[in-house]
Amino acid sequence: MTILHDKQVQALKLFEKLSVAATGEPVPADQIDERLRNITTLGPNEFFSCFYPDHLEQAKRVYEVFCHAANFDDFVSLAKQARSFMNSTLFAFSAEVALLHREDCRGVIVPPVQEVFADRFIPADSLIKAFTLATTTQPGDESDIIVDVKDTGNILDPEYKLAYFREDIGVNAHHWHWHVVYPSTYDPAFFGKVKDRKGELFYYMHQQMCARYDCERLSNGLNRMIPFHNFNEPLGGYAAHLTHVASGRHYAQRPDGLAMHDVREVDVQDMERWTERIMEAIDLRRVISPTGEYIPLDEEHGADILGALIESSYESKNRGYYGSLHNWGHVMMAYIHDPDGRFRETPGVMTDTATSLRDPIFYRYHRFIDNVFQEYKKTLPVYSKDNLDFPQVTITDVKVKAKIPNVVHTFIREDELELSHCLHFAKPGSVRARYHHLDHESFSYIISAQNNSNADKQATVRIFLAPTYDELGNDISLDEQRRLYIEMDKFYHTLRPGKNTIVRSSTDSSVTLSSVHTFKELLRGEDLVEGQTEFCSCGWPQHLLVPKGNEKGMQFDLFVMLTDASVDRVQSGDGTPLCADALSYCGVLDQKYPDKRAMGYPFDRKITADTHEEFLTGNMNISHVTVRFQD
């Protein structure tokens, strides 16, 4: 066993069966390491939230202790002690942050959260059935147990048409891991490193989630979502049917018609006041610091400053004045049924980064947040032809190579999730949940380009996809459509003088995870190579790269743009980039975001052109692609 493999195995043991009583003897209080002794944390049965300030501060103290450990063995020793008495979710979050940011953990892969906390992904009735089957097997029976995941809703709720997307295991795992890679309490002073454009990435990743959700809504014959816009409006209901096994209690449901109320720490008026102050800062194009200084919201840094302000994170320029609009919104919605805690009810799924994407209100609230960012984008000048053009480079044709040219087929695929690393079934053998998810056929982009110069040109290839028609079958105006464009890929390519053909597989997307490593694979040491690119588990699931489309075939506009890579490139750090798997949504760990352009360029700003033809420059091209769902 290599040193790296040994580290991997030790790390995995920290996450085994966290949802039940910790394995091994608890550490006596007087023997707990003094570095952990004075940290006050949540009780073991409470619901940890990456949005609740007190919980975040507790986790910050824990992961900073882990990161300060003298060496890997010291870290593991501290972590073993911590897991014996700490809240399991708080511990897992803190341990993952440490694994990703400790130098001596380079190459160690964080385990899939869907196996660590399977109870956040698999409905309670399926887990109960698994327990029932496991406890009624004959002694010595080591055969596998497989339970089917049942539906969590029905056709009485129109929103249930989107359950395949909102409740997708890969999507929710991505959201958990993104907030591990980019914790809002990340302190650059402690780590000695600034996470480049972290605030802007917060804006862009969530904007893309909203765009993808609206694409799925149109695929299913639903209207695009109505953004949340009123803190006093009654909200639609949602029931996740998930159980928080560590406490033995359900994530609370939200009945139809409840409105947000004051919680103990924050009033609804605070939320309205923070929104007004942020909007005023956008109108004035500057934010005010605690000392009264003005910080401009310029073209280069404005989105990053706003992202930190709205989330809010440690990089917020003035949290006392601008508050924490995003995080407290999650908390208020999670406790909408018991805002002051008088009934001691558990929160809803909006409290947890591993579950919040299941709730339809997540997308409506984030569209509201995105609308705030769009107000800032309106203050920026419209991209001129000079901002968009790539002199002497033209795209002559764009095609999609699939079984049928320019037609991508989607379908439902069956998959399984191992439960035995989360729960103790008191039997040997595997216990798995069988579920279904959307998937698509593999395809390739074929891009024909012309380099009219006499020298090689380095190009950045940018690929986006958006629906052509709205819910009524009308053409979507370009300025509306720009907010529906989902990024499909972004990569560098060398253009030789003359004609060029660029071929790119959908499986190489800069948006998606290349693969998901299971506990079993990691324990065997698969894909562990010293010095290789580290795997952060952050990235959009490959199976949801393409929207569902419909049975008739739904038309999308495939937009391809070539830009000058010599202008786009940033100066990278030394060595192999870390966590560079899904760089569009997740960036590159410990290095600058690998694109100088604004995230979402060229669709991040208002477009005054009425048609694609009016907007396009020679280095762009539009192709019509059909996405057809096969049931």
Swiss-Prot record:
Extract the InterPro entries matched here. Answer: Di-copper_centre_dom_sf, Hemocyanin/hexamerin, Hemocyanin/hexamerin_mid_dom, Hemocyanin_C, Hemocyanin_C_sf, Hemocyanin_N, Hemocyanin_N_sf, Ig_E-set
Give the record's glycosylation annotations as residue positions: N38, N87, N451, N621
Name the positions where Cu cation 2 binds.
H326, H330, H366
Q: Which GO terms describe its molecular function?
A: chloride ion binding; copper ion binding; oxidoreductase activity; oxygen carrier activity
Q: Which SUPFAM superfamilies match?
A: Di-copper centre-containing domain, E set domains, Hemocyanin, N-terminal domain
Q: What is its main location?
A: secreted
**For this UniProt entry, which segments traverse the membrane?**
none
What are the subcellular locations of this protein? Secreted, Extracellular space
Q: Which Gene3D superfamilies does this UniProt record tie to the protein?
A: Di-copper center containing domain from catechol oxidase (1.10.1280.10), Hemocyanin, C-terminal domain (2.60.40.1520), Hemocyanin, N-terminal domain (1.20.1370.10)
Annotated positions binding Cu cation 1:
H175, H179, H206
Q: Which Pfam families match?
A: Hemocyanin_C, Hemocyanin_M, Hemocyanin_N
Keyword check for Zinc, yes or no.
no
Expression tissues: Hemolymph.
Q: List the disulfide bonds.
A: C538-C586
Instruction: Kindly list the GO CC terms recorded for this protein.
Output: extracellular region
Keywords in UniProt for this one? Copper, Disulfide bond, Glycoprotein, Metal-binding, Oxygen transport, Secreted, Transport
Note from the entry:
The two copper ions bound each have 3 nitrogen ligands (presumably contributed by His residues) and share a bridging ligand (possibly contributed by a Tyr residue) in addition to binding oxygen.
> What is this protein's function per UniProt?
Hemocyanins are copper-containing oxygen carriers occurring freely dissolved in the hemolymph of many mollusks and arthropods.
Subunit structure as annotated in this protein's UniProt entry: Tarantula hemocyanin is a 24-chain polymer with seven different chains identified.
Family, as annotated: Belongs to the tyrosinase family. Hemocyanin subfamily.
Q: What is this protein called?
A: Hemocyanin A chain
Q: Which organism is it from?
A: Aphonopelma sp.
